[in-house]
């Protein structure tokens, strides 16, 4: 649990200290690993299931965030918060594509991050691990602050001229389409939260049941006899 808490806090502190979109997102990769370590460290069905669900949520969200980082750099010529601005007015589609995964990353309802983090927090409370729950909530608050930092720097402040010419319209359409598809994936996690939780619980039970895991890997039945 100490490793989980430190990973959350060190990652999010590093993100807050950065002034570049891609570097902020890179530090958040570290921070989010801490949540998965939290679930695994609880060593309960609910905790491990929460870690699995959190992983499912993270895959599309992180994909979107880095794709949006690429869209920002493509439009502005760089991703430094000191050299970009005004995208909400000029490229509102990028603003929307950023806002959805950013709120999800911070665990704001009704997005997938809220569902995933709530499952971990509930598992932590039920396991009596209040300290790691508090750390997780603090890390989520700082995550929201770092996402707000990107929003204010890139989208909200006065526009700045691009340092390099943007790519062609055809290339922009391709990049926007890929990002929209990934955003749809984050929304699908919310829509399918029930079935995904059931799947996560089943995976957690199998992982915590050593014999079941051995049987699945070796292809044996409960009697230890190899399956045909």
Show which residues each predicted segment covers.
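Cytoplasmic/organellar membrane-interface segments at the starts of transmembrane helices
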Residues: 81, 88-94, 147-228
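Hydrophobic transmembrane alpha-helices and their helix-loop junctions in integral membrane proteins
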Residues: 1-118, 122-148, 152
């Amino acid at each position: 649990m100490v490793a989980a808490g430190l990973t959350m806090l060190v990652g999010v502190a590093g993100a807050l200290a950065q002034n570049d979109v891609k570097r902020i997102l890179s530090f958040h990769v570290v921070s989010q690993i801490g949540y998965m370590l939290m679930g695994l460290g609880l060593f309960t069905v609910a905790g491990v299931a929460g870690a699995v669900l959190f992983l499912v949520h993270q895959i599309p969200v992180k994909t979107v965030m880095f794709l949006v980082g690429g869209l920002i750099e493509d439009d502005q010529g760089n991703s430094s918060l000191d050299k970009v601005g005004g995208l909400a007015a000029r490229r509102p589609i990028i603003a929307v594509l950023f806002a959805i995964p950013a709120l999800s990353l911070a665990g704001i309802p009704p997005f997938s991050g809220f569902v995933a983090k709530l499952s971990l927090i509930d598992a932590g409370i039920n396991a009596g691990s209040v300290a790691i729950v508090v750390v997780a909530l603090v890390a989520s608050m700082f995550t929201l602050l770092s996402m707000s930092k990107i929003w204010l720097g890139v989208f909200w402040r006065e526009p700045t001229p691009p340092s390099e010419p943007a790519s062609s319209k055809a290339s922009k359409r391709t990049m926007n389409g890929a990002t929209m598809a990934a955003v749809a994936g984050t929304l699908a996690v919310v829509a399918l939260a029930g079935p995904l939780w059931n799947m996560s619980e089943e995976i957690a039970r199998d992982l915590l049941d050593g014999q079941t895991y051995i049987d699945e890997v070796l292809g044996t039945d409960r009697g230890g006899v190899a399956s045909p």
